[in-house]
Amino acid sequence: MNGYFFSFEGPEGAGKTTMIGKLESFLRERGFDVMVTREPGGVRIAEAIRALILNREYTEMDGRTEALLYAAARRQHLLEKIVPALEAGRVVLCDRFVDSSLAYQGFARGLGVEEVWKINEFAIDGYMPSLTVYFDIDPQIGLERIRQNREREVNRLDLETLSFHDKVREGYRKLAKRFAERIVVIDASRPLDDVFSETVATVLSRLEGSKRHFHESNRDDSCWT
């Protein structure tokens, strides 16, 4: 496959969706064939699962149920949208991928990262981004951004405690340390233009390098902590 697979991660309110939109425009202006998608969602079945997972009324949802639903949505999304785009040689910008499950369900929910990885390993069948940009921000700042943004949907995860969101951030940081080759950390608390400039530089450096859509090394689940 000749496409590029890039994912973008971050706690709630980190601004990743805004960055992806700006990056899409930047790359299109330079002639790249770009596809933007999101998780959970991206295709009909996955969007239906998204509505179920993020529904604020389902506060009783079990952590394992949540993890399994995310993995199911991811599988369908991958097969219907991501793989065909990669086969067509497109640049895929994905708003969240498997690292979200590892950080949210594995770390913050306390299910265990190895356990959550095993579920997702079955779902993704070896497909991993060649680059993951993690937008790091203090959860208090991120949640305040959400409260101030009236256009953004407030979902079930937004209503979690600050302690939960602190654990999500801790999980992401551990993943970034474990997979330093793939995950690039960007300080998202800085001005928008500064964050965007670093994001562009990071993505362009990979576009000018290898065209592999996933790293075989990322399939090694022998050490997650």
From Swiss-Prot:
Q: Which reaction does it catalyse?
A: dTMP + ATP = dTDP + ADP
Example GO biological process: dUDP biosynthetic process
A GO-annotated cellular component:
cytosol
Q: Which UniProt keywords apply?
A: ATP-binding, Kinase, Nucleotide biosynthesis, Nucleotide-binding, Transferase
Give the signal peptide as a residue range, or say none if absent: none
Gene3D superfamilies linked to this entry: P-loop containing nucleotide triphosphate hydrolases (3.40.50.300)
Under the heading PROSITE patterns, the entry gives: THYMIDYLATE_KINASE (PS01331)
Q: List S-S links within the chain.
A: none
For this protein, the Enzyme Commission number is 2.7.4.9
Q: Which residues does the annotation say bind ATP? A: G10, P11, E12, G13, A14, G15, K16, T17
Q: Which Pfam families match?
A: Thymidylate_kin
User: Is the ATP-binding keyword given for this protein?
Assistant: yes
- What CDD domains does UniProt report for this protein, alphabetically? TMPK
Tell me, in a sentence or two, what this protein's role is.
Answer: Phosphorylation of dTMP to form dTDP in both de novo and salvage pathways of dTTP synthesis.
Per the similarity annotation, which family is this?
Belongs to the thymidylate kinase family.
Query: Any idea what this protein is called?
Result: Thymidylate kinase
Q: Which organism is it from?
A: Geobacillus thermodenitrificans (strain NG80-2)
What broad taxonomic lineage does this protein's source fall under? Bacteria, Bacillati, Bacillota, Bacilli, Bacillales
Please state the gene responsible for encoding this protein.
tmk
